[in-house]
Design a protein with these regions (language model features):
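Intrinsically disordered, low-complexity regions enriched in serine/threonine
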Residues: 1-42, 119-348
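A short acidic/basic microdomain associated with nuclease active sites
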Residues: 92-131, 135-138
């Protein structure tokens, strides 16, 4: 496997609009972001499920308003501008690759009214009287020309991000806005996300789309895809016994109730009780990653995918943090099987 060499590229300017419109680049030779056209023809499983719905970028542009900071009426960076900034950065870093159209999922719709409809009864409201925007949004897009196969599972390079307005103080003046962006791999068997340390920005703070673009470019250039694939590939050669797996699940349940001082001494574990239950059920019933054919053992690759699969029940604003934590857990457990002490508590 060859290491992907990402070459630095030069950025000119991005000029944001106060309207919810497509971003334009100053150089004419840059890929125009106006028509983000879909090359995806097959309907796939959603990359996140909990409380979300799929929308198009056209819906976000044409049917949704953009929130402002209330004290100075400065506009926030809109969902479409965020998506297009990251998508354009991907096209600049991977100019010879096929970059797919973004898949977008949203939740927590915020409804409002136009000023003219303030005093209307609800039953009399017309569609043009209503306003909406989505408090939480996640998107991702694949670069399917960069891929690997692990245990018969095709992994496509995938890029995306999360915006959650509930993490902003919209009642104040405009300041740095928070985003999450990632580059990693999507398991095409189940659409589970594989996120690594050097491919994830958990709290990116920027003032404008110029900052977003630059941060995305830097992340994509610094990400070591070959290293990420190497560590995931190592999972297929390690196995947990049914007893060790049961110990792990039991310790995860106990972890939630540990005294604070004891919990501080252990690695972080972000799964909820519901997700732990999903992992337990999937150990026997998952059609792709259960242990039925392997007796009482399960490969660490399958364990990893059970963890990332359970994460699909997370809300948008927690999804990437838990996806990254699933990688940490799988890597830590794998090392614990060979005597490393950091995660040993989870399987002892």
């Amino acid at each position: 496997m060859e290491t992907i060499q990402l070459q630095p590229v030069r950025f000119d300017e991005i000029y944001p609009s106060r309207k919810n419109e497509t971003l334009r680049m100053s150089r004419q030779d840059i890929v125009d972001v106006e028509p983000i056209l879909s090359r995806r023809e097959v309907k796939r499983l959603p990359f996140i499920e909990a409380n979300t719905q799929e929308v198009t970028i056209e819906h976000l542009k044409e049917d949704c308003i953009v929130p402002v900071f209330s004290k100075d009426n400065e506009i926030t960076i809109s969902h479409p501008h965020f998506i297009e900034s990251v998508w354009e950065a991907a096209n600049r870093v991977f100019p010879s690759e096929q970059v797919e159209t973004p898949e977008i999922r949203v939740s927590h719709i915020i409804k409002g009214r136009t000023p003219e409809a303030i005093h209307k009864p609800v039953r009399d409201l017309l569609e043009e009287d209503k306003t909406i925007y989505y408090e939480r949004m996640m998107f991702c897009f694949e670069i399917p020309t960069i891929y690997e196969d692990i245990m018969g599972n095709r992994l496509n390079l995938t890029i995306g991000g999360v915006r959650a307005y509930n993490h902003e103080n919209l009642y104040s003046k405009k300041g740095a806005e928070k985003f999450k962006i990632f580059i990693g791999f999507k398991n095409m068997v189940c659409c589970n996300m594989c996120v690594s340390t050097d491919g994830f920005k958990s709290e990116l703070k920027v003032m404008d789309v110029h900052g977003l673009f630059n941060a995305a470019m830097q992340l994509f250039q610094e990400y070591n895809a070959a290293k990420h694939l190497y560590y995931m590939g190592a999972f297929k050669d390690s196995y947990m016994t049914e007893h060790q797996f049961a110990q792990f699940l039991g310790k995860c349940r106990l972890y939630q109730y540990l005294p604070v001082e004891q919990k501080k001494k252990l690695p972080q574990m972000l799964m909820t009780d519901t997700q732990i239950g999903i992992v337990a059920k999937s150990f026997y019933n998952d059609e792709n990653f259960s242990t039925i054919e392997n007796g009482n053992e399960i490969s660490m690759w399958n364990v990893y995918n059970l963890l990332t699969g359970a994460n699909k029940s997370s809300y948008i604003d927690n999804f990437l943090d838990r996806a990254y934590n699933a990688t940490q857990l799988a890597d830590g457990l794998n090392k614990a099987l060979y005597g490393d002490s950091e995660y040993a508590w989870f399987i002892q």
